[in-house]
Amino acid sequence: MRKIKEISADTMTPISVYLRLKGKNKVILESIPRENDQSRFSIIALNPVKHIKFTDGILSVNDEIISDENPMEFLEKLVCQPESTDENLDLPFTSGAIGYAGFDTYGIFEGIQPELKDSIGTPDMYFMLYESALIFDHKREKLIFIEDNTYSQRSEKELQNALSANIESLSLLTEAENELTELSKLNFVSNMSQELFEEKVAKAKELIRNGDMFQVVLSQRLTADFTDNPFNYYRKLRVENPSSYMYFMEFDNFHVIGSSPERLVAVHGNQVSTNPIAGTRKRGQTEFEDQALIEDLESDPKEVAEHKMLVDLGRNDIGKISKYGSIEVPVFMKVEKYRYVMHITSEVTGELRPEFTAMDALRATLPAGTLSGAPKHRAYQRIYEFETQKRGIYGGAIGYLTKNGNCDFAIAIRTMVLKDKKAHVQAGAGIVYDSVPEHEYQETLNKAQGLLKVGQ
C-alpha cells in the first residue's frame, strides 16, 4: 500500500525542505549539473524502518545478528519485491535501501582480509531501509510525498498520518534556513608524508615494470578536527563544488557527505551502465588556460593509456552480467570540468542478462577499476600491502536500491566521513609504469581540494 501527495514546489528548495522535516536518519541525494544541463530529481528520505549493517563478517538488522547470510543477497531479498510495480510513477525512488558498500567489502567476498587497522570505525556496509520519501521533480516544479508500507505493514491510517505530518512540517520556517554560519578552518593532516607516498609510488612502478600488474591506485587519508554543523558543510559544498552525485547521509553515529563525479553502476530495468573517469588536470585560472590544459590532458600518452585501460576494465565488468553483443561505449574520452579539476570521462552500457540483478551488477563492478587498478584482483591485493589502514567507505559505492530492483550507485570519492568530531577525506592516484611520483602525490591533493577548501 502506498500514499502519495503532490504539491507545487516553485518556492521551495531541497535544502529548505530538508531543514523543516522532522525525523531520524534523514538523507538527501541530489544530482547537480556539471555544465549547463538540468538535473531533474532530488531525493529526501527519513525515518528508516530497518538498519542493515555488515562489519567484519557479521551481518545485523537493527543490531540483531543474522547468521550465514551473504549481505548483498540478504539486502536484495529484503528490499526487492518482484511483484511490486511503480507504474505511472516516473520517479527514481519510492521506497527501498539507501546507504553504502565500502571498498573493503570486495576483499571480504574474495577472501582478501589483511589485518589492517580500521581507524575510523564505520561498518563495511550500511544501508537504511526507507518507506518515507520526498521527491523533488525540478522539471515540473513539484514535490511528491510518498509513504509506503512494503516493509513495515503500516496501516492506511498510519501512512496517512505520516504523510500529513511531513506536509505540515513544511509550513514551519526554521531559523536554520537563514542561518548558514561560517565554517571553522579545517587543518588537515595526512596519514603519510609526501616522501613516504612517493616511495610507495616508486615501489608500485617497480612491480608494474616486472609484470605484476598494469596499474594500481594509491591513496592518502587526510584528517582534521570537526566541530561544525555537518549539514552546513554540505550546504556550502553543493554550492562551491557541485557534481553529478551529491549526498548527505545521517547514519546512527556518523555522517557521510559527498560530491562524487563518477557513477559506479546504475541499473534501470534491464539497462546497466558504468562511468569510468581517469585522467586529471587542475582547472585553469582563465578560459585560455583551461583549453591549454584540456589539450595537454588529451595528448598525454600516460593519461590516455590509463583511461583506455580502465574503459576496457569497465567493459569487462559490465560484460560479466550483460547479454553478449550488447556492450556499447556511447561516450568515450570526453573532458568534463568541475570546480577545481577536469577529468577524462567515458560511459559503458549493456543489457542485463535475465538471470542477473542490480546487486549482481554492484558485485561485478565494486570496487571500480579507477579506485583499484588492473587487473583488479591483483591491484586490490597490492593496495592492502601499500596502505596501512582499511579504506572503509572511500572507494566503495554510495547510492540506493529500489523495491522494484533498480539501483544507482556513485563511487565514494570526493567524500567526507564525519565521526567522533573528526573529518576524514581520502584521495588517490592511478600509478602506471611511467608515473612521476611527485605528480601523483599532487594529483591526490588536487582531487581532495573540492572538500578541503569548502567554506575556507
From Swiss-Prot:
Cofactor binding summary note: Binds 1 Mg(2+) ion per subunit.
Domain of life: Bacteria
Binding-site residues for chorismate, renumbered to this chain: G279, T280, Y394, R414, G428, A429, G430
Any GO BP: L-tryptophan biosynthetic process
Binding site residues for L-tryptophan: S31, S244, Y245, M246
Enzyme Commission number(s) of this protein: 4.1.3.27
Binding-site residues for Mg(2+), renumbered to this chain: E306, E443
Record keywords, A-Z: Amino-acid biosynthesis, Aromatic amino acid biosynthesis, Lyase, Magnesium, Metal-binding, Tryptophan biosynthesis
Essential cofactor(s): Mg(2+)
GO molecular function: anthranilate synthase activity; metal ion binding
SUPFAM superfamilies, per database record: ADC synthase (SSF56322)
Reaction equations catalysed: chorismate + L-glutamine = anthranilate + pyruvate + L-glutamate + H(+)
Subunit structure: Heterotetramer consisting of two non-identical subunits: a beta subunit (TrpG) and a large alpha subunit (TrpE).
PANTHER family reported for this sequence: AMINOBENZOATE/ANTHRANILATE SYNTHASE, ISOCHORISMATE SYNTHASE MENF
Protein name, per record: Anthranilate synthase component 1
